[in-house]
Amino acid sequence: MAGPEWQSLEQCLEKHLPPDDLSQVKRILYGKQTRNLDLPRKALEAASERNFELKGYAFGAAKEQQRCPQIVRVGLVQNRIPLPTSAPVAEQVSALHKRIEEIAEVAAMCGVNIICFQEAWNMPFAFCTREKLPWTEFAESAEDGLTTRFCQKLAKKHNMVVISPILERDRDHGGVLWNTAVVISNSGLVMGKTRKNHIPRVGDFNESTYYMEGNLGHPVFQTQFGRIAVNICYGRHHPLNWLMYSVNGAEIIFNPSATIGELSESMWPIEARNAAIANHCFTCALNRVGQEHYPNEFTSGDGKKAHHDLGYFYGSSYVAAPDGSRTPGLSRNQDGLLVTELNLNLCQQINDFWTFKMTGRLEMYARELAEAVKPNYSPNIVKEDLVLAPSSG
């Protein structure tokens, strides 16, 4: 596995390939070339001063006679935790709020309409430890917790929709915990929330020690800037998860994540891009950055020696379009903001071209899946009938 000093696949290709070869490789890896956005000088200067990467790209669409372009700019934020995990909880939360506020201000300079933060952005991703304290103290109300109120102010100040993935404390239902994304309108009002539908039980991802599978289904939020959904982290491995957000009308599906190189880096460039193709929508994959060390060693029953960290979070956030094209990714080792301009007309244009929704045969799969989940289901396997086989004599 590449270490944190390896910046990105894009940098490696650009460094070692001749221009003609590079063009062909990018055509295959990234599809139709995206246009570079001309970002404001003051935004670029602010990003440099605040020590984070700022990149901007745009997807086009064919001009139509009956519809105006539906242009929306999304901002994906990837970042490391600014304080050690041993710092007091309140100080860690405050430091993360400050860091995100710095980045959100630059997003506003770039005209971002919808901004999404990484999974459990206001805390370390400490679920590997299986310890309850102090990590459960980061949990907050999705409706009126400290972090939600912070994001409401950001949303109203900058006139942008905010997607805020947090560890939720649901006090209306016994104080149980959920892995939740809060969606806040550009008016500053909480539109609602969605929960992580699939919980990993692999390696050090011991998340089911804290929370279980979400119970809110696949909600899609009708914002001023388009219909959006949030497929949290591990849910990207489940094609039906993406599908149901699309069935409910999502034009943009965000995938805020916290995943490490050893586990998933080779899968990362494929899954969200494939989902964009299969579901005729835009997908936005974002991942945290860096390595987080915990005071106490932990193990996960996988034969590895006790250790103090989960692994290296490799960033590499990107956006994919329904035509299969995608932006270059942000770096593997820097905080960053990826600004991407989308024309939502492309969703219908590609739907009309490839017709996956028309040819998807959902009724057939619904019928067969309804049978497959029954306890007495017998798989439809056709075997050779040896009784009817011709004799060798």
Swiss-Prot record:
List the active site: E119 (proton acceptor), K196 (proton donor), C233 (nucleophile)
Protein's name in the database:
Beta-ureidopropionase
**What pathway, per the record?**
Amino-acid biosynthesis; beta-alanine biosynthesis
Cellular location of this protein?
Cytoplasm
Q: Which residues carry this modification: Phosphoserine?
A: S378
- GO molecular-function annotation terms? beta-ureidopropionase activity; protein homodimerization activity; zinc ion binding
Q: List the keywords (alphabetical).
A: Allosteric enzyme, Cytoplasm, Hydrolase, Metal-binding, Phosphoprotein, Zinc
Q: Which gene encodes it?
A: Upb1
